[in-house]
């Protein structure tokens, strides 16, 4: 009986939409990389981030459908700026999702290959829900502890030195340090793309921690493993400051 209840619990989580989620998109003008990081209480968040190196990146959460991510990239590819792309995705979105919610429960951010960004937070998203644009980044969250979760991501990204992946990691850790997801942690992911990369869609990094109650710890461990296997990353001066103390960094500015 106990085993059955545990199975039903996790089965319920598997069909739960990405409510109670925070994410950030960032741009490195030095390298041209565009990346995203996300953490949620659901078992997997691999459907949140969508990116192409020569186009941009989308983070769709709240009541996500893969179509929202693909649509965002399609509109960027067609020449729309992020703000117009956000409007087009919202106006063309399905009213009902597979989980019975409306597009007004959706939250998504779009960043183009130049680092310009825009976002939409639906009026029916669970509090706290909101987004904030920073320097070369945009952060968003729904059903998180407070607005400090979102602003903390922006602050950590802006003040952490080093490669884009470490700045994104620092932002996720800062979000958790400021209260994070109100329903806990179970998954995290990071995706980085770059125009000119030989990999499909320009992907240079694609890592995830699923079904893990300490997903950010696992994600940072994966980054460390990547760094050890990459001569360029290991020899970089910026490797000395990789935001490893970000998990203890709370929002300092008003």
What are these regions (language model features)?
Residues 1-4:
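Positively charged n-region of N-terminal signal peptides that target proteins for export
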Residues 6-17:
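Bacterial N-terminal signal peptides
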Residues 18-254:
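N-terminal nucleophile
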